[in-house]
């Protein structure tokens, strides 16, 4: 079952699920209640997506403040990712103008390809980038972190240990 961390962590605490894979973002760490174990799996870098014809599209990297005046494509309001983006931009002195909201990365990139704004997009699981989109790293690297989380009282269960070990191996294979 795919769930946001705000839903999966409370279900984990209640014992409704045994293990969760959760994300947190560089300036918005996951709130983790006591009684939970966490294993870091991956660090996922985030790029700035802009229309291919944008004046900054050919740069090796950009500063966020260089796109301060742009329209933004974001996740829907109230989502953890949206709040992270707003906090990130405001920490750079940018008051974002969000013109479009979309849950899925591929939808966000399609809006960018149509010239409707700029967006940030994680590298892992991004899928094919539509024609007309340029991806440029951000100078002060943006990232999200991917963790396995489980209850301390389940830490010695062979199934939990095996699942965490398999996730750690898969993560290591991805980063090689």
Regions found by a protein language model. Name each.
Residues 1-29, 95, 102:
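Central regulatory/effector-binding core of bacterial HTH transcription factors
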Residues 4, 63, 103-104, 122:
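Short loop/turn segments at beta->alpha junctions
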Residues 6-18, 86-92, 105-116:
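Short helices/loops that flank or line small-molecule/ion binding pockets
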Residues 15, 30-40, 44, 106-155:
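Beta-alpha-beta core module
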Residues 23-29, 57, 70-92, 156-165, ...:
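Secondary-structure junction motif
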Residues 32-46, 50-72, 158:
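Flexible hinge/capping segments at coil-to-helix
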Residues 51, 75-76, 98, 121-122:
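Thr-Gly-centered strand-to-loop micro-motif
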